A protein has these predicted regions:
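Nucleotide-activated sugar donor-binding and catalytic core shared by glycosyltransferases
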Residues: 1-232, 237, 242-376
């Protein structure tokens, strides 16, 4: 029996993590070609997550990372198109809002049905590079798969046809639950000589936070204040962009701030669930905090997860030291009972997103060929 041939394009750590279960299901039910653009080329940002999650190696590694974003985007489009010409797939799947997702453009030019997971997220802040990518990819994709009802409504309000926008829920719940035993078994606390709830975790990587001197120095000042006031270690999982800024600006860090290379999925989540509070500018912190029930601050001035804020699963602090310290005080005072264990976001509790995606791809590939491309 001939299986449907589909390509999946990834390029960054969040895409690898979120697609962990989907990749395995597509391998099972499809002729599946996995493409890694090489947008993140550091070992710690790539292979460590393939190993942690038991994901096979990509069929193609494109090495598309350039000296700037324009060069990277150009390389992604050119190199993905070469693979599409070679393998001639029946469908393409992308997830998220990174430059790697722009590999959808050559697929559209080749009239290949395209599916976009994590569609419809909006932060309405054009300073965020991913916001531009989201809007482009959402409006190029044939079928948009949203995490939440709010994201679906955004796309409908932008004029996309209702039959082409499907809410699947977030895939991260399935991923976390699949690997929960491994997360619990991590010995990272022992290795680092940490005591549960007596340390902080921090992750800072967003372009708008790191590449701005003012924003980055505000964050460093805040982390120093956290270490000084609480006298607990602050464990920073450091993106290469962040490390370069630390080095170039010669910032002074409190001795309690520990700068580490990027941690794997299992160890990092073990730290998050064990920390006093996680401070992060990650787009996924709302989901992780809601699912794993740990307190978190979102160090951003805009976000694309309003469904998370409806349940107040995190506090969005901006980059002001005073607001960050006030928010930590709120978490301290709400540390017991129902005030801490806020209700889990419904759209973040879907147990079978990988199965949904397989069914949707098989349901809509021929539909897109017929309705969009008039092939039949």
């Amino acid at each position: 029996m001939k299986k449907l041939k589909i390509v999946t394009v990834v390029g960054t750590r969040p895409e690898i993590i979120r697609l962990a279960c989907v990749i395995k299901k597509l391998d099972q039910y499809c002729e599946h070609i996995l493409i890694h653009t090489g947008q993140n080329f550091d070992y710690e940002l790539n292979e460590i997550f393939f190993a942690d999650l038991g994901i096979r190696k990509p069929d193609y590694f494109l090495g598309a990372a350039g000296s700037n974003s324009a060069e990277t985007i150009g390389n992604v489009i050119i190199e993905v198109d070469k693979v599409l010409k070679e393998v001639n797939p029946e469908a393409m799947l992308v997830l998220g809002d990174t430059n790697s997702c722009l590999g959808i453009l050559p697929a559209k030019r080749r009239k290949i049905p395209t599916f976009h997971m994590e569609a419809g997220n909006r932060c309405f802040d054009q300073r965020v590079p991913e916001e531009i990518n989201r809007r482009l990819v959402d409006h190029m994709a044939d079928i948009n798969l949203t995490y939440s009802s709010i994201a679906r409504d955004y796309l409908l309000n932008e004029g996309l046809p209702p039959d082409m926008v499907i809410k699947t829920g977030s895939p991260i719940f399935e991923v976390i639950n699949t690997y929960m035993d491994d997360i619990n078994s991590s010995d990272i606390l022992k290795k680092m000589n940490l005591t549960k709830h007596q340390f902080f975790v921090a992750s800072i990587h967003r372009e708008e936070n790191v590449d701005s001197d003012k924003n980055f120095l505000n964050i460093i000042e805040s982390l120093n204040a956290v270490a000084k006031v609480y006298k607990f270690p602050v464990i920073v999982s450091t993106h290469p962009r962040t490390q370069k800024r630390i080095d170039s600006l010669k910032v002074k860090l409190d001795p309690l701030i520990k700068i580490l290379k990027p941690l794997g999925f299992l160890d990092y989540n073990k730290l998050q669930v064990s920390a006093k509070v996680t401070l992060s500018d990650s787009g996924s912190i709302n989901e992780e905090s809601s699912i794993l029930k740990f307190p978190a601050l979102n160090l951003r001035e805009a976000h694309e997860r309003p469904e998370g804020m409806e349940e107040a699963v995190v506090i969005m602090t901006g980059l002001c030291k005073e607001r960050i310290m006030q928010s930590l005080a709120i978490i301290d005072n709400q540390s017991d009972g129902n005030q801490k264990l806020l209700r889990q976001v419904y759209d973040y509790s879907m147990p079978n997103v990988s199965d949904k995606v397989v069914r949707i791809v098989h349901s809509y590939t021929d539909y897109v060929n017929r309705v969009v491309w008039k092939k039949y």
